[in-house]
Swiss-Prot record:
The protein, known as: NADH-quinone oxidoreductase subunit B
Coiled coil: none
Chemical reaction(s) catalysed: a quinone + NADH + 5 H(+)(in) = a quinol + NAD(+) + 4 H(+)(out)
Gene expressing this chain: nuoB
Phylogenetic classification of the source organism: Bacteria, Pseudomonadati, Pseudomonadota, Alphaproteobacteria, Hyphomicrobiales
Localization per record: Cell inner membrane
Zinc found in the keyword field: no
Species assigned in the record: Rhizobium leguminosarum bv. trifolii (strain WSM2304)
């Protein structure tokens, strides 16, 4: 026994609910002539019309506060990144000592089983949205000490990792490239879902 349609009219998709049209990915009304005219008038006067998500992501990439979780020799390269030769603060990437004030945690070095709960505790103290950069072979997968009984084989078993920086130890340029990749990733992602 089937259910017969009530009328022979074609089904019409409902109007999208929200700001973004799911079929195009653009704001609702962006192809409207009225809004296009306003956008063109404001562009001539030096204004920029954008979505709030893009504005928040742009601001977030220019003000990333990082804290160190230096566990071994990779931390020396991480310190070198803050020195005048590379001056990572010009990219809006400034160090902070407290996890409650930082957005990014750089895990650099060998993570042991005894240190893993402390890493998770510090990660949980960071405000959302929070990002983690895993720096060096030891943090990425255990490195040279991979088969030791006391080493965690990658800090991604304890906290979610956003950027992996390979090397033993990775150079400051490699970490700087990882920071730039993180900023690019933040620009791509939405503000609510991560």
């Amino acid at each position: 026994m089937g259910v017969a349609p009530v009328s022979n009219q074609p089904l019409v998709a409902q109007q999208p609910k929200g700001i973004i049209d799911p079929s195009t990915g653009k704001p609702i009304g962006s192809n409207d002539a009225f809004f296009g005219e306003i956008n063109n008038e404001l562009a001539d006067k030096g204004f920029l019309v954008t979505s709030t998500d893009e504005l928040i992501n742009w601001a977030r990439t220019g003000s990333l506060m990082w804290m160190t979780f230096g566990l071994a020799c990779c931390a020396v390269e991480m310190m070198q990144l803050s020195m005048p030769r590379y001056d990572v603060e010009r990219f809006g990437f400034a160090p902070r000592a407290s996890p409650r004030q930082s957005d990014v945690m750089i895990v650099a070095g060998t993570l042991t089983n005894k240190m893993a709960p402390a890493l998770r505790k510090v990660y949980d103290q960071m405000p959302e949205p929070r990002y983690v950069i895993s720096m060096g072979s030891c943090a990425n997968g255990g490195g040279y000490y991979h088969y030791s009984y006391s080493v965690v084989r990658g800090c991604d078993r304890i906290v979610p990792i956003d950027i992996y920086v390979p090397g033993c130890p990775p150079t400051a340029e490699a970490l700087l490239y990882g920071v730039l990749l993180l900023q690019k990733k933040i620009r791509r992602t939405g503000t609510i879902e991560r």
